[in-house]
Design a protein with these regions (language model features):
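Short glycine/serine/threonine-rich phosphate/pyrophosphate-binding segments
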Residues: 1-2, 20-26
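A short, small-residue-rich loop immediately preceding and capping a beta-strand
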Residues: 16-18
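Helical "lid/coupling" subdomains associated with nucleotide-phosphate turnover
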Residues: 1-14, 29-214
Length: 214
């Protein structure tokens, strides 16, 4: 993730990366373009949803999740150094945020690229409130959230959102570059993949060679 973010958002030399998947969340502190701390935690969009955020009492359950996450963040020493930095959000839930932001604040649904999209803290407050107060069906109908993500998106964004709360992070910058782009960046930097136009072509050729009898 670190290499992918540095390749996709090279201006983010000082930031806190938050990649929330289905069952895990990875945090990476970036200072002066280098890793200042990292940790992988065993909860994500699906696990938080299954445990706390299924239908019924969404608001109260969301507050329980937020309280638990704040306590977790207090146990990660390097996070104190992230105070005031931008949060770089990765993962499907983070990538869905710009579309919600545009619907809530610009009333637009036209196609656009979410990569590099900046969401200020007050907009994140409004997005979380909009999700908490809607059912999965309403999130799809009113906020444009994909049907397959509507039930888990709140669990997917609460880790990043509570980091913004706890450490006064002013904004979230959405990044669509992740592991694959990071691998490609390393390969290109080392000159290994110079003959290939992208990582997919590189991997496809590698798989073909590996399957060829020697």
């Amino acid at each position: 993730d670190f290499q992918g973010v540095m390749a996709g958002l090279p201006q983010q030399k000082d930031a806190l990366i938050c990649d929330t998947g289905g069952g895990s969340t990875e945090l990476i502190l970036v200072r002066n373009g280098r890793i200042g701390g990292r940790i992988s935690l065993p909860f994500g969009a699906m696990s938080l949803t299954d445990r706390f955020l299924r239908e019924g009492e969404r608001s109260g359950n969301a507050e329980q999740v937020k309280a638990a996450l704040h306590k977790t963040w207090d146990g990660v020493p390097f996070l104190k150094e992230a105070a005031g930095l931008s949060l770089v959000g990765l993962g499907g839930s983070a990538v869905a945020l710009p579309a919600i932001d545009r619907i809530l604040f610009e009333h637009e649904t036209v196609a656009f690229s979410p990569h590099g999209y900046v969401i200020k803290r007050n907009h994140m407050d409004a997005i979380v409130h909009a999700l908490v107060t809607r059912t999965p069906a309403e999130r799809t109908d009113e906020l444009g959230v994909e049907q397959g993500r509507a039930d888990t998106i709140l669990g997917g964004i609460l880790p990043g959102y509570t980091l913004m709360e706890r450490f006064t992070l002013p904004q979230t910058v959405v990044c669509t570059a992740g592991l694959r782009e990071g691998i490609l960046a390393v390969l290109q930097r080392e000159g290994i993949a110079a003959a290939f136009s992208d990582l997919r072509a590189f991997l496809k050729k590698y798989e073909t060679l590996a399957a060829t009898p020697q």
